[in-house]
Amino acid sequence: MAELVRPKKPKHRERPQSDDAPRIPDRPVMVNGMRLPVAPSHSIQHQRDRSASPEPEEQVLSDTGESINPEKENGSIQDVRSSPVRPAPPPPRAISQEREAPPIPARNLVFPRSTSMVAESTREPTPVVLPKRSVAVAPYPTVPELAELPSYTAALKHPQVYPAVDGGQLHHSRSAAAIPEKTRFSAPVAQERVREGEAPPMYPSINTYERNEHGLMTEENLVTFYHNPLYEHAEIFVDQFIKAEVVPNQSGSLFPLLARLKSVCDLMTVSEVKGKENTEELQKCLRECWVQQTMSVEAKGKCGDNNDGTGRASYFSYELQQSVLDQMKRLLSTNRTNLLDHTLCEETSFRSLALQIQWQIIIINNNFMAENGLTTNCPPSLVATGPMTPGRTAIRTALSDIFYHLRYPRLSKRFIDTLFGWIKELTCILNMRQSCDDGIFLLCHLLRLPSPIDHWAPPFVQTFIQSQSPPRLKLDYCVALLTHLLNPIKARESFLRHVAQSEKEESTWEILADDDDGEANEFSFVTINESDLTAFLDQIPISELYSIAYLAFTSYSDKGSQFTAMIAFQLLLMKILDNGLTSYSQPGYKMFCKQIGISLKHSVRELCSNWRLIRDQIRPGEEQNLQKEVDRIVLLALNYLIHRDSVGLFQFVVALPYGVVSEECRSRCEYALRSNKKMSIHEIYETPICEVRARISSQSIAKRVSSLGAQDSEFLINSLASIGSYSNGDVGQLLKELIDVCFCEPATRDDFYKCGGEAIGQILTKRPETLHQLLAIVDRNLQHMDSYAINVLSSSRLFECRLTEPMISIIGKWLINNPPEHGANRLARRVLSGLHWGLGPDGQNLWIDVDVHAIAADTVVKAHSVHCSRSNSMISKSISKISKLASKVGDAESLFQQFCWDLLVKLKLPTIPVDLVQNDLTAHYVRIVQNYEDDVVVYLEKAVPLLSDLVSSGSSVASVVLLSRLIAQHYQKVNLMAADKNFMATFERLLHIDQLPYAVQWLSGPSSTPTPIVRLICSAISYYSAKLPPRDYLRAWITLLCQARTGWNEDAVTYQIVGTIARIAFINDTQKLYEITSIVFQAYQQQMAAEKNQSKGILALFSSDSSASPLIPDSMLAVSPFASYIMLRVEQKSFNPFYGHFYETLGKKDKYNLDHAAKKAASKCSMALPVERLAVFRWAKLVIVCKDSALLPIILQQLAGQAYRLRKANNLNLCYARRLIDEPQMQGVMAECRKAIEETTVATKGLSKAVVGWLFTKHEVTRTGFDFSVFDLDYLLQLILAGDKNMWMDFVNMPHFTSEEFAERKLYSVTCQLSPKNRESPSPPELGSPRARGTAKPFPVLPVHSGLPKAPCLDPSTIFQQHVVLQMAAPFMSTVKNLAKQYTECGDRMDIYDDAYCKLIRILYQSTQQTVPVEIRCSYCSKPKPCTMTVKPNVLSPEIDVKMSQNRQKRIEFWNELNASMIDQAAVATASMEHLSRLVSMMAAALDPRNRNSVQPTGHSLFYLITSSVGENELLFSVASESYSHSLRALGEEFVKFRPEEQMDVMQLALNGFVLSEPLVEVFTAEVLNSDDLCTAYRKLSDAVRMPERSKMALQLLGEQ
């Protein structure tokens, strides 16, 4: 349909009507050069190329509908690859003969598109048409959002090395191919999109195409839907590439420069080695110049006994080694030579050559950009292959030259990095308008470079998926890249002949790598590295290929044809990937083969994912045929993967999309997996389906795994399970085989029990109804499974399974008859624990039948009574005995008991009257649930004793569940519960059940605050408060917790539970809190009354503290912010009479402090409060401990209100904020409060800062005319003063409390499985390949040459002006002359430094007078006499040592200055000189003969100007002499060679002893002289031969040497 969505051309054309539809054109025999894997035959069917639909502006319509292409025929390989589009499949004759062909409506009326897509449809380069084929470039719409990514559209800021292409500079380049097509025809199209039309079917139904006996389309017809000319001519391209590139033609301008650069780098490597050796020798020589020697001196005299004696003393002295010093002089001379003649000159030569090459590359890139109308900001784009233009030829030649020089052995890193930078620069420019052949050309070069190159080469291989090129062109290009990458690399050894020869000459090989089998592999740079191949393959992700394919095939008119094209593309892609597996199925390429396997798997999954989405949109008659094609692809992929030995591809068989294939295909896949014989796809299809199923039954898994490795066997088992999970047939036989092989057979189960569990998990996930079969099979084989039974369901998700009565009987047998540590018992627990015991998806009915719940409970009770006798012995025992019995319960029994309780609380048991009570804890639970929960009176009478036993035994979870259910059902009768002493005693013990060390902990790990059981109680309250009327339900809990208990306000557990209740009340009733404060108030009043009665006793007379106890102690404030908030509100309400007298006393006199007022108030009422118990300070303490609580804004409101609220005293409304807050004895509390508010992490929208300003200000806010604007949020403070008591809910994060509520509610719901099951089953994994994050590297970025010197530029007219050219060259020669002189002087100066250094070495050790101790002894001296002697040893002179260091430092500084001043200047000057000479020669060579002679004087003058500039210093400076030699060579080739008038002068110059005679000899061509001049020249040369000083040169000119 691509032709139907092109915009209408301005010129109106009408398509003539045809009486008959066009006949199907004959196709050539050979198409695409490929063998698509067709079953049952793979033979290549040859066919002719058919015509494609031409563009309107290119076609001439006739009655026969045939299009004629007026373009010239071109048989080159570039033309062959030019077609980026897919030819349209012709309609069959049978259909076209029955009706008249309908007229095709105008393009703009069919399928109108968005403006961006219309504009995109015009972005098509001019096609190059094949001989005898009409090819039209079809407009493929692109996705605008892909083309607008920053990596493609962001402008790059470059210096003016590459000039911008403006309107006034390159008008000559504005051809159809050069102008960006983005603006072409876009405006008219936008105006023509007026109405919508229904396009007639352009392609017939795919049912009309020929199929083989298996219902599969033939290769001939599949090629009709997808034809790739680039793939077809891949072999031809490679052959031509090898022919052209294996031997360099040296025609490029870069080749001689690169050759010189390589030589310089080689010399630099050698010089670097020599320099290091010289440095080491100098250091060694310096150490050996002075040698330490031991000297001795003898003394004679009298000893202490006055006898004649002698004494000897030894000392050290250093002696100069003259021979070593002479060697030092030679080494220093060598060092100077190495630094000057090698390091400096070679570095200068390197930079000079690199600069010349860089200038050449910029010229090449500028020519390419000008030729194609590009700028440096153009994004990458892919174009169809067209004729080779000069600019494209130059850039490819430059790349060839660079790649050639990368194929030498032992290249230096600097050389490689430099060449890589130039490849990057050339490729960046080429990417702006890269043809398909260019990309393949690059890949072919990269594949023939010495490995490894994976660290820099991959970015040069790109898919251009996000460019605005036509999708079909990009698709063909990517397929071609894959083809060249995965095919065997032809002639790699020939390209790397230099490397191979170097390796061959080495006498030994170094083993660098071992393969996975432990065998040593010889490493060779000629053999391509696996990492290189993997890196290139990563650049062509399968997901990107399919993204392009989806766009490329949208031109088909219907989904059937579109998907058929996808099938043809997929078959071709699979063939290419299989070629890669065939080429690299070797141990050294295992990871690469795995990467190919991943690509193959992803491609199949992508196709099947697309098929799953569109199969409902296919025509009714076509769906079955396309399903067969999908079956073929999956079966073919499986066959490719399982027949590659030792490369680890079996793992990818598991993930093939068996769910979208037919049942017959699944059977054939299973048959191929089970078979020990390698079968072709032909053999698999030829086997009848009945025979396939019979062979499946006869070929066991055990026999198959014996012929495979352990890893492949695991993947085989999982693959068979994956097929079985999607199968519609019975999987009983498969399950039996899995149980036998993986869990029963001793020889195999150690290897396969894990994968067996995974395989069974796959089956149960997709077919949960097979659980019954599985349990029956396991039950029959249980005695053979031993401890492996537990692994059967280790990876299974049983939430989707349902349990039936026969199944529970099997499980019950395992559970009761086997001890807890037995595998069968553990397996039974795994099944029962993994099931969903709650409601179904409808939320009304149970997922598992209620009768099964009752049977399961009965089974658990029986099992518990059998296996938990020690736990049951705790029933009706005292606490001390229970503790002793609990210590004897083993770990296995404890775990089993925990399982029983976890399961029982999930079961939904019906009400069944039972009179008999078993002496078992679980039976107690079941009896309570089934008999006593309906009537609270009966519950208190009969169930409470049973509940008490559960609590005493530590059955915490079950006890909490029973208590929660009771209060939820009978919360309206809470007073009956509160009045029952036994119930309240049990309730009290349950609240603290976590404190029992033997309690069955519901959560592992140490108890936290709150404890796990307290959290479960809080969760139950949250859950039921959402199901019941919350007011009465929460008040019932408050009644039990506070009103019915004594000492409750000193219990942390109570505050934790009350905190949950208060939070629920705060969320739903912010102001009144469901009036739970009234219940707490009554409880507190009762407590204070009891305390008051106790204070009337005799002991109260001896107590000085008459104040009432606080409702909540300070130590409990941090337990729960919500509980503390409620308690403080109740507490301040309880002391209202005290506060009335307190504030009245304060208002009488300002001198009264708080302590005095409190005492006065206590004397006037029956209650007393100390200052620290005042409400404002209690709220301040709560702020300190709750600074990070989300309730902080409300607490701050209470604090500010208590401080600033007006109090009525003596008929006046007074504010006591300053007197309260500034109380001296409470300054510590208030300072801590201020710090807590300032450090809070709660977002209070500025309230924290405002409250700090209010509380700690010095202003008296109640004075007349006070300006409240000095405060933040001053309106809130004014509301407090006005008596407003509304909550400041704007500052409270209510969603935080709500989320806490939902999270807390979930705990109890999950524990008891009270939530309905999810309506939707877990969706199968996505079939498509992952697209989240790719490993492909992005396009290379064009480098910026900010400080690059400019190259000499010549205008074409300048070369006719001799003086101008000479003036340009003169500065360069002058610079070289000065630098050469400086170079010579520097050598002399370094010589001076070295001479001075040697002289310093000679005097480094100097003779110094010293005294040494000597003892004079006689023969048997008992009293030696000490004395001293004077000696003169040579010792180190510190002053000389410092001077030597200074000498070396000055030499280093001088050398650094020399480098900085000379290298860059010399490099630029010599490079400019050579570049100018080369430029003059090239421009002269490009002139026609008439103008050429006019330029001869310019070249002649420049040539002899250079010869006259060569002096003594230039000859010593090798950089200058080499530069002059190459400049003379370049000029001589054009202006001297083969020119008679120049030969005599050149000969005479050479004979006169010109030192740089080599280029003169090369350009001396005497054969062009006339006879007289030739005789004269020969006579002069003959005479010169007889002269010793000229003999050698004369012979060279004569060609004798």
UniProtKB/Swiss-Prot annotation:
<feature type="region of interest" description="Disordered">
    <location>
        <begin position="1"/>
        <end position="109"/>
    </location>
</feature>
<dbReference type="InterPro" id="IPR051436">
    <property type="entry name" value="Autophagy-related_EPG5"/>
</dbReference>
<comment type="similarity">
    <text>Belongs to the EPG5 family.</text>
</comment>
<comment type="function">
    <text>Involved in autophagy. Has a role in the degradation of protein aggregates within autophagosomes. Essential for starvation-induced autotrophy and omegasome development.</text>
</comment>
<protein>
    <recommendedName>
        <fullName>Ectopic P granules protein 5</fullName>
    </recommendedName>
</protein>
<keyword id="KW-0963">Cytoplasm</keyword>
<keyword id="KW-0072">Autophagy</keyword>
<feature type="compositionally biased region" description="Basic and acidic residues">
    <location>
        <begin position="15"/>
        <end position="26"/>
    </location>
</feature>
<dbReference type="GO" id="GO:0097352">
    <property type="term" value="P:autophagosome maturation"/>
</dbReference>
<dbReference type="GO" id="GO:0005737">
    <property type="term" value="C:cytoplasm"/>
</dbReference>
